[in-house]
Amino acid sequence: MKLSELKTSGHPLTLLCSFLYFDVSFMIWVMLGALGVYISQDFGLSPFEKGLVVAVPILSGSVFRIILGILTDRIGPKKTAVIGMLVTMIPLLWGTFGGRSLTELYAIGILLGVAGASFAVALPMASRWYPPHLQGLAMGIAGAGNSGTLFATLFGPRLAEQFGWHIVMGIALIPLLIVFILFVSMAKDSPAQPSPQPLKSYLHVFGQKETWFFCLLYSVTFGGFVGLSSFLSIFFVDQYQLSKIHAGDFVTLCVAAGSFFRPVGGLISDRVGGTKVLSVLFVIVALCMAGVSSLPSLSMVIVLLFVGMMGLGMGNGAVFQLVPQRFRKEIGMVTGIVGAAGGIGGFFLPNILGSLKQMTGTYAIGFITFSCIALLAFALVLAAGYYWRKSWSAESSPADV
């Protein structure tokens, strides 16, 4: 497989637009997490409330992913993406000119979930342009849009320090409008777009064991990635007494590892199979989170989180190398379901960390809990991988799995 095949086997401009749409949407989706230290200071939030505020957009994004996944299969990804970006402008405007109460903040967080649902649109849009042997790479490139978190964590605190967090939400409208114009102008739906089917025809995917295995795996990889991305600023400030800006810088470094290594996870999975890659990555993540639970020095915890986030990011790419091998026709719907599971995992992780900190007075218990969850995922991959390689259709060779 050569990278040049991406140019000849698909539509590079659509792949680029899918990445940009997901990138700017992801930046907006985690905005409350990037600004969480400022928001918690304004509202005087408890550790539990801090976790809840940054987790609300992640949970609502899970619900919206299913909705946008269905729309992607029925009206096409381009129209769905346009609708999603228009709706995303509402909470940004609300946060700029409102957001003066905790109730408003929760409502804004719910609407920001539409930005997180972009995942269920961008990945199928890219996937449908490319053949099976390029799925991991194409999906990994589009999925690398989760690097939008970098912009939120790097620039959000700096801008909030100068102008306040409300203005930062208004500033986020600028890149969204730019991407909106580029997307409308250049993105195209694949001619391989399946014809719309009755809604009931999609229900059978809920009865497939593979759907729920993918959900479990992605709730750990993506849930871990986005959950930590949203919560680490608070962790660094609370545990290591860093300034808000320095905390954001370290979060950016860790997020970069997960974001830019996602395509690598997809690329390696194309060559050796997604289950083999995941089995290694879950062990790495478990070891890193166990190390973080000891609350070592700042330099050591950054190394552990960097490697752990890299493993989670590669795991995201590996999971979505597997999805098209099993669900080619229903990829929009399945992407929405699996993406929703990832969002649910991302909702629970900040709440686990915040709640256990409030209950025990330490973050150690929360991180060791996440380490145990990663080990459970490792066991699931080992159990499922052999069965998948034997039972999936001839369209996917054992090496693809």
Swiss-Prot record:
Signal peptide start and end residues: none
Locations listed in the record: Cell membrane
Record carries keyword Cell cycle: no
Induction: Positively regulated by TnrA under nitrogen-limited conditions.
Transmembrane segments: 19-39, 51-71, 79-99, 105-125, 136-156, 167-187, 217-237, 277-297, 300-320, 333-353, 364-384
GO BP terms: nitrate assimilation
Keyword tags: Cell membrane, Membrane, Nitrate assimilation, Transmembrane, Transmembrane helix, Transport
GO CC, alphabetical: plasma membrane
Pfam families linked: MFS_1 (PF07690)
Disulfide-linked positions: none
UniProt xrefs under SUPFAM superfamilies: MFS general substrate transporter (SSF103473)
UniProt membrane topology term: Multi-pass membrane protein
Principal localisation: membrane
An example Gene Ontology molecular-function term: nitrate transmembrane transporter activity
Highest taxon in the source lineage: Bacteria
InterPro entries according to UniProt: MFS, MFS_dom, MFS_trans_sf, NO3_transporter, NO3_transporter_NarK/NarU-like
Known role: May function as a nitrate transporter.
The family this protein is said to belong to: Belongs to the major facilitator superfamily. Nitrate/nitrite porter (TC 2.A.1.8) family.
Protein's name in the database: Nitrate transporter
